[in-house]
Structure formats: structure tokens, C-alpha cells
């Protein structure tokens, strides 16, 4: 490994090891980043399901994305301190096929989703769970787990030979814990790795029988094409441009079929915007330049801007992160 990458590795490891294991275990799994309602995490699970059952569950996938939009809109209302009565008024308006209540405009994607569901449905539950006098309590877990239950039931009797899967920068099993909870994990021979030993200890405590390792994305200790597919989230923005290119080369080297990549800080511009923050980076990446890098190694690179995707598919213009992207890479 080049000396500059060794130094960057040390800085990255130090930046994460400064945090406690409890904080790391809860990182990126709450609020709008909760993988049950985060669109990038949902699309990643759909990517995995399509690897083993291509096209089989398209309608369910569409409804799960709609579910995420409904819950995220509800979270926005709760942040604005709506009351339990106001939430019930929203449900009454939906039942009466109205698009506003007491001056609160109900987005069309909410109305369309409600109309597509039989009664009673999860929207009825979501907008009646809170006590009349307050909405301070969090949304109930059983409601957030709506599609976890759906997928577990749908996949329960499915069979498939395990597909080898790699996740660099796995954190404290941030996404894997939901891949497992949704009944998807058993179709994959999974390996997750991270630079931060505390993350790996957290992951192993949750999943003692799974393969979680301390490894370095700049030098992956695996043969060429060792894994059928790979997914990785929120990694490349934190690397220097040179290190990022090395990491991409390594991930592509060890992956045989397809890669799903989530970005949190990307834009439709010509050049990367490099921003060093303390001992690591918080870069704004160019979608076009990143696509070109992956096309050096792959047969096809699909770029999905989450904001544009949700607007064109569902008419939703209320995403929380305009810089969120997903790349689907076919090797």
C-alpha cells in the first residue's frame, strides 16, 4: 500500500475510534436515516432481492418506497409539532378524498398511496397512533416494521443458492441488521468489513456467526472476482480523490457481477469539490466524474439521483437530502 494511503488509513481509523461503541451502534439508523424508511437503504435491499429473484417483487418494491414517503412526511409533520388531533384530521381528509385539512395541504403522493391501499391499512395506523394531546412519543416500532413483516412473509418459502456479497465500510452492521431482519440475509454469503474495530465488535455482538472483519478498502485481502456482488454506502465522500480511486479499483477488482453504491454528498456538476475536514474529507462528488471512473471497470453504470427519481416516479418533491444518489454498476 502506498505511504499516503497508510497515513489516510490511520487518520480515518482515528476519526472513528474516538467515538464510543454505543454511539456507533446507533449511527445512521434513526430518524430519516433509519434503513426501514431511508430510500437509499430500501433501494439497496431491492438491489439484493433482484439479484436472486429478478423482477419477481416489483409491485411490493413500489409499495415499500411509497411507505417510506408516507413515514418521512409524517416525520416532517411531527418535527413541526402537529397534534394528535391534526394527524387524525389528515386521515379523515384522506378517507373523504380531500387534499387539505385546516390549511394543511396533503401531498398528492400521499393521497395516491392511500387510494392504492385496501382499508384498513398502515396509513390509518400511522395517523392514529399518537395520543390526542401530544405527538412527542416516537412512531411505534411495529409501524416502522410494516414492510419488514411483509418481506419476511413473502420470502419465507423462497429458496436460492447463496450469492456471495461484500459490504465495505459496514459500520456497526448498520444496513446488515435490517437485511437480516427483513429475511434477505439467508440468500447471501455475506462478508462485511470496516476500518473501525469498535464497529466490528458491535456487529459481531449482534451477529456472532456472521463474517465481520477489520479490513482496509484500499487493499482488500480477497482474490479477483471473489464476490458475486457488493454494496457500499457513504464511503467515497470521506476519502481523498486519490484514495477514492484506489478504493473503487479494489471494489471493482473483487466483484464479479454488480455493485450498489450510496452517496450522500453528490451533485450534477463537472468537477469534484474537495473539502478536508479535520483528519478526513467531506467532499462533494461530481456524478458525471464518478460515473466515468466506474465505467473504466464496468460494462454499465446507472446513476439514480434520489430527488429526481422520487419526483418522476411518485411526484414527491420532499426529500431530506438533495445530494443523495445511488449508482448501480454492472460489471
Tell where the protein language model's regions lie, with residue ranges:
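Class I (Rossmann-like) S-adenosyl-L-methionine-dependent methyltransferase catalytic domain
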Residues: 2-221, 239-246, 260-331
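Conserved acidic residues
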Residues: 163, 228, 257
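Short catalytic micro-motifs in class I SAM-dependent methyltransferases
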Residues: 234-238
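A short glycine-rich, Lys/Arg-flanked "PGG" loop and its adjoining helix->strand segment in the class I
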Residues: 245-257
Amino acid at each position: 500500500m502506498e505511504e499516503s494511503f497508510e497515513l489516510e488509513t490511520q487518520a480515518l481509523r482515528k476519526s472513528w475510534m474516538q467515538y464510543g461503541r454505543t454511539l456507533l451502534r446507533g449511527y445512521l439508523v434513526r430518524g430519516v436515516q433509519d434503513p426501514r424508511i431511508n430510500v437509499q437503504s430500501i433501494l439497496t435491499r431491492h438491489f439484493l432481492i433482484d439479484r436472486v429473484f429478478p423482477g419477481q417483487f416489483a409491485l411490493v418494491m413500489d409499495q415499500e418506497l411509497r411507505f417510506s414517503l408516507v413515514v418521512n412526511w409524517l416525520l416532517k409533520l411531527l418535527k413541526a409539532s402537529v397534534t394528535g388531533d391534526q394527524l387524525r384530521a389528515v386521515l379523515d381528509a384522506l378517507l373523504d378524498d380531500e387534499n387539505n385539512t385546516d390549511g394543511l395541504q396533503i401531498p398528492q403522493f400521499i393521497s395516491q398511496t392511500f387510494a392504492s391501499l385496501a382499508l384498513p391499512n398502515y396509513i390509518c395506523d400511522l395517523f392514529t397512533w399518537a395520543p390526542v394531546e401530544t405527538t412527542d412519543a416516537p412512531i411505534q416500532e411495529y409501524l416502522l416494521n410494516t414492510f419488514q413483516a411483509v418481506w419476511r412473509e413473502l420470502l419465507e418459502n423462497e429458496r436460492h443458492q447463496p450469492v456471495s456479497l461484500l459490504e465495505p465500510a459496514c459500520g456497526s452492521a448498520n444496513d446488515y441488521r435490517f437485511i437480516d431482519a427483513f429475511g434477505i440475509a439467508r440468500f447471501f454469503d455475506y462478508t462485511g468489513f470496516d476500518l473501525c474495530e469498535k464497529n466490528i465488535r458491535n456487529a459481531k455482538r449482534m451477529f456472532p456467526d456472521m463474517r465481520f472483519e477489520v479490513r482496509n478498502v484500499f487493499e482488500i485481502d480477497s482474490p479477483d472476482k471473489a464476490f458475486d456482488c457488493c454494496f457500499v454506502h457513504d464511503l467515497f465522500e470521506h476519502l481523498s480523490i486519490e484514495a477514492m480511486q484506489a478504493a473503487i479499483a479494489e471494489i471493482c477488482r473483487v466483484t464479479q457481477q454488480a455493485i450498489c453504491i450510496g452517496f450522500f454528498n453528490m451533485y450534477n456538476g463537472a468537477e469534484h469539490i474537495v473539502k478536508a475536514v479535520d483528519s478526513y474529507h467531506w467532499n462533494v462528488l461530481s456524478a458525471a466524474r464518478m460515473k466515468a471512473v466506474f465505467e473504466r471497470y464496468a460494462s454499465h453504470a446507472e446513476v439514480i439521483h434520489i430527488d429526481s427519481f422520487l419526483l418522476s416516479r411518485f411526484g414527491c418533491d420532499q426529500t431530506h437530502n438533495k445530494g443523495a444518489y445511488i449508482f448501480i454498476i454492472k460489471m
